[in-house]
Amino acid sequence: MLVWTNSKQGTFTSEEKETIVIANNGETTVTTSDTPFITKVIKLYEESLDIQVLYYGISSTTGEKYPTEVRVVIPKGRYVSLRSLKSKSTENNS
């Protein structure tokens, strides 16, 4: 899961308990290779954060990892699970 816990910095915690921090300039300052990470901060609002997240899925046929990028808005203090990100990436983009 990703959770946005700080509206000023944009601190994320993944389901593996790794931390991803978005600095005030919108750049990713801390990432890990085995967890989702932020590729773009689209807009930082007072109560939500609009971002693009990159994570790796595993192909059911080949077993290989593949990158998936999806745009998601995270309300302040709320969790977003990878399962919900995956389902959103298959929906039509509006």
Predicted segments — roles?
Residues 81-94:
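Basic DNA-binding region of bZIP-type proteins
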Residues 9-79:
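Compact, well-ordered interaction domains used in eukaryotic information-processing assemblies
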